[in-house]
C-alpha cells in the first residue's frame, strides 16, 4: 500500500520539514537506509530489526502510573479515536510501534485541575532478548496543570510513541528519563500538540542503554503557545544517544526555547564503538506564524578520546515578521583556562574537572521542577565522572 505523498517524502521534496509524510501504516514507509537523511547518524545494524519489520513482539513492557487526585488512567485498544491526536508517525519505526502495540496507556488531567504532586509513570522494558512496542498519551485538559515524570527501567528492545496533548491554557512539564540497562535498544517518537496560550516544558534525560534515539515533533495549534525543550545526556564507551527535534511554529505569537547539553567519554583501548551522541534540531517558522520568538542551543563536552558528537541545528523561516530567531551549537573539550584558574587556587585537577562538568549541566538541572529528579541526575553525573577518572588512570598506567 502506497499512501498519498509518500513519493514526495522519499525524494525529499516536501516544501518544509513540517510537511514530511506521516502515516500510521508501516507499509507506507520504505525500509530505512544509512543514506537517508533522518537515519544517516543512526547505527541501523544495532537496532535489532526495529527498522525493517523483522523484530516481532516477543514480550511486553509494563507501564505503571501513580495515583493522583484529578488524574485518570485508562488502558485502550488501537482503535480508540483519541490516539494520534498528538501527532502521526513520520518514520517507519514509529509506524511499526503504532501497528504493533497490544494496548495503549492514556493519562488524563481533568479540566481546570492543578495536580500538586508529580505524576510518576514507570516503563519497565520487556527484558533481555525480548522485543516490545508501546504507546502512551498524556493529556492536560483546558486550564489544567501537571508535572509528569516518565521513567524507563529494565532492558530489552523497545519502540514506542508518546503523545503530549496540551489543551488551551493548560500547562505540562514532562520529564522523560531513559535510564536503561546497558544492553537496551529504545527508539521513541514523541508527538506534542500545544493549544492556544498553553505551555509545554519537555525535558529529556539519556543515561543508560546501548542505542537510545528520541525524536520529538512539537506543533503549535493556537496563538500564544510556549514550548521549552531541555535535554541532558551522558554517553559512555559504546553508547549511541540520539535526539532529533522539530518545533513547528504554525500560529502567531508563539515562543520556543531549546537547550540540550551532553557529555561524552570513551575508551580508545576498548573494542566497543566510540561513544556517540547526535543532536538534530529543526525549527520551522511558517508564513502565518508572525510574532514568533525562538532560539535553540546545543552544547557538547568531550571528556576523553574515543568519543564523537554530531550536532546539526536547522532553522527555516517563511516570514520576516518575527520577534527573533536563532541557533547555536558548540562541541569541545575542557576549557583549559577554567581548569588553570581552579588549579591555581589549590583545587586538584580531578576535582576541578568535576566542578567544570557540574557547572556545565547545572543550567539544565536547575530548570527541572522535581527535586528528586535533580538529586538523581546530580548523583548520576558524579558516577559518570568516577568512570572518567578510572579510565584516565588506566590509560596512564
Swiss-Prot record:
Disulfide bonds: none annotated. This is Iron-sulfur cluster assembly SufBD family protein Mb1497. It holds the Pfam family SUFBD_core. Belongs to the iron-sulfur cluster assembly SufBD family. GO terms for biological process: iron-sulfur cluster assembly. It comes from Mycobacterium bovis (strain ATCC BAA-935 / AF2122/97). SUPFAM superfamilies: Stabilizer of iron transporter SufD.
Amino acid at each position: 500500500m502506497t499512501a498519498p505523498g509518500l513519493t514526495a517524502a522519499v525524494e525529499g521534496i516536501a516544501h518544509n520539514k513540517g510537511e514530511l509524510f506521516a502515516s500510521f501504516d508501516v507499509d507506507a514507509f520504505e525500509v530505512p537506509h544509512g543514506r537517508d537523511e533522518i537515519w544517516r547518524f543512526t547505527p541501523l545494524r544495532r537496532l535489532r530489526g526495529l527498522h525493517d519489520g523483522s523484530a516481532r513482539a516477543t514480550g511486553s513492557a509494563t507501564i505503571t502510573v501513580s495515583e493522583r487526585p484529578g488524574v485518570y488512567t485508562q488502558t485502550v485498544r488501537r482503535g480508540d479515536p483519541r490516539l494520534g491526536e498528538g501527532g502521526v508517525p513520520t518514520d517507519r519505526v514509529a509506524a511499526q510501534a503504532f501497528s504493533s502495540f497490544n494496548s495503549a496507556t492514556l493519562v488524563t488531567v481533568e479540566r481546570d485541575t492543578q495536580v500538586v504532586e508529580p505524576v510518576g509513570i514507570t516503563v519497565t522494558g520487556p527484558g533481555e532478548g525480548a522485543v516490545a512496542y508501546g504507546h502512551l498519551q498524556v493529556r492536560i485538559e483546558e486550564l489544567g496543570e501537571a508535572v509528569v515524570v516518565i521513567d524507563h527501567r529494565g532492558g530489552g528492545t523497545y519502540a514506542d510513541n508518546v503523545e503530549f496533548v496540551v489543551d488551551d491554557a493548560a500547562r505540562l512539564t514532562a520529564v522523560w528519563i531513559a535510564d536503561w540497562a546497558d544492553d537496551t535498544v529504545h527508539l521513541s517518537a514523541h508527538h506534542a500538540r500545544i493549544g492556544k496560550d498553553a505551555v509545554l516544558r519537555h525535558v529529556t534525560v539519556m543515561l543508560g542503554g546501548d542505542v537510545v534515539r528520541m525524536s520529538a515533533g512539537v506543533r503549535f495549534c493556537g496563538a500564544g503557545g510556549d514550548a521549552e525543550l531541555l535535554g541532558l545526556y551522558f554517553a559512555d564507551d559504546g553508547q549511541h544517544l540520539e535526539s532529533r527535534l522539530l518545533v513547528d511554529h504554525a500560529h502567531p505569537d508563539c515562543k520556543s526555547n531549546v537547550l540540550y547539553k551532553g557529555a561524552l567519554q570513551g575508551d580508545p583501548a576498548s573494542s566497543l564503538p566510540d561513544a556517540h551522541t547526535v543532536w538534530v534540531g529543526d525549527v520551522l517558522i511558517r508564513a502565518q506564524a508572525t510574532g514568533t520568538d525562538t532560539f535553540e542551543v546545543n552544547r557538547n563536552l568531550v571528556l576523553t578520546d574515543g568519543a564523537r558528537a554530531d550536532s546539526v541545528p536547522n532553522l527555516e523561516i517563511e516570514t520576516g515578521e518575527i520577534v527573533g530567531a536563532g541557533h547555536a551549537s558548540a562541541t569541545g573539550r575542557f576549557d583549559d583556562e577554567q581548569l588553570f584558574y581552579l588549579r591555581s587556587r589549590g583545587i586538584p585537577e580531578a576535582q576541578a574537572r568535576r566542578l567544570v562538568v557540574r557547572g556545565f549541566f547545572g543550567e539544565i538541572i536547575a530548570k527541572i521542577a522535581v527535586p528528586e529528579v535533580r538529586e538523581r541526575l546530580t548523583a548520576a553525573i558524579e558516577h559518570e565522572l568516577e568512570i572518567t577518572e578510572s579510565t584516565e588512570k588506566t590509560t596512564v598506567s
